[in-house]
């Protein structure tokens, strides 16, 4: 399985699991990063430490270190 950090711009995937600490997991779930949800990479910043994802018709920015803990299955 791949992690969310491996998506290319405009590539879509489905979230398989969120493997983070309890507090971060709760925050991610509150903003829509839950198992079965579709997610799409919209933007990578120049410093490559933040990424913007579209999830539930909302654009959310995540740090790379957090996105590495979200396991995905790429859409076909």
Where are these regions (language model features)?
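C-terminal structural segments of small proteins and small subunits
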Residues: 48-76
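A structural micro-motif recognizing beta-strand termini
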Residues: 17-21
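Short alpha-helix capping/helix-loop boundary micro-motifs
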Residues: 24-27
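Ubiquitin-like/PB1-type beta-grasp interaction modules and other compact soluble beta-rich domains
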Residues: 2-6, 50
